[in-house]
Amino acid sequence: MASEGVLLGMGNPLLDISCVVDDAFLEKYGLTLNNAILAEDKHLPMYKELAANPDVEYIAGGATQNTIRIAQWMLGESNATSYFGCVGKDEYGDRMFKLASEGGVNIRYDVDEDLPTGTCGVLVVKGERSLVANLSAANKYKIDHLKKPENWAFVEKAKYIYSAGFFLTVSPESMMTVAKHAAETGKYYMINLAAPFICQFFKDPLMELFPYVDFIFGNESEARAFAQVQGWETEDTKVIAVKLAALPKAGGTHKRVAVITQGTDPTIVAEDGKVTEFPVTPIPKEKLVDTNAAGDSFVGGFLSQLVLGKDIAQCVRAGNYAASVIIQRSGCTFPSKPSFESQ
């Protein structure tokens, strides 16, 4: 059984505005598939255009929130997980609180009085996705919220703490605070590379945090972007995974494990200079709905078993199961109960 509040996530809560579009729509806004970016002024009219589409869907999103919701769903025990992030004082914020709390996650939103709740345009073309995040209120998360005694109590309770790298654009100070707390108390601190732009443009805060990172997650394009920025001169994901795991560690932390997903290609896990590959069972093309939140779901499934003390093979199996469920549905939505059997 998972103890109450064992897993804490901190990130950018965004309401996903999801729509199937065509290639011309991507071209119009200068977007590419399988990428995630922050919205610029030129992208802002896009949100109105999506909202006007009769088939638009609104889904609770944001990478870390997706991961925590999936972990909670897999664990099935109310309040096993908690989540911090900032929303606006509006209907979108209320809607997302309801959606995210339904599965039993203990949601602790900071509420910004001035800005609307953040949104993410999810553009789906033939099952592949392009993400454009307008952080808005999510960008206003303050360390003061984290340090309030009633919120810090959730940090104290957690044994595993996770953030997607996207949170580095908002509150690296909050990430560093909980990372140091984890090192001092023997807990696990875990992050996701999240997107190539995090590796490229937020290198300094990322590398400052890295000595405290016990588990690093990412997909092949993020891993290669990281390697390029580090000057490693390799595109071999196995080599990159070993190097990621071997980067210097702070005292009091655990040995780092690097986990790289590669779509339908094997998942790579590196630890102590050794690489293990775990095959992925591909989903038939006709069953693929969209890949939005596939990576987040993998991590959610993985963490659901990690917090139960299961071995890495079981964690990867659970991650692959969760991702396979999510890509057969629209956005980060899931059936009422998982059919995964813990071994």
Swiss-Prot record:
Gene3D superfamilies per the UniProt record, alphabetical: 3.30.1110.10, 3.40.1190.20
Active site (record annotation): D296
Disulfide topology: none
BP GO terms, sorted: AMP salvage; purine nucleobase metabolic process; purine ribonucleoside salvage
GO function terms (MF aspect): adenosine kinase activity; ATP binding
Cofactor(s) demanded: Mg(2+)
Keyword field: ATP-binding, Kinase, Magnesium, Nucleotide-binding, Purine salvage, Transferase
Entry annotated with the keyword ATP-binding: yes
Classification via SUPFAM superfamilies: Ribokinase-like
Gene Ontology annotations for the cellular component aspect, listed alphabetically: cytosol; nucleus
Record's keyword annotation contains Transmembrane: no
Top-rank lineage group of the source organism: Eukaryota
A Pfam family reported for this protein in Swiss-Prot or TrEMBL: PfkB
Catalytic activity of the protein: adenosine + ATP = AMP + ADP + H(+)
EC numbers, comma separated: 2.7.1.20
Function: ATP dependent phosphorylation of adenosine and other related nucleoside analogs to monophosphate derivatives. Can also act on the cytokinin isopentenyladenosine to produce isopentenyladenosine monophosphate.
Name the record gives this protein: Adenosine kinase
Organism encoding this protein: Physcomitrium patens (Spreading-leaved earth moss)
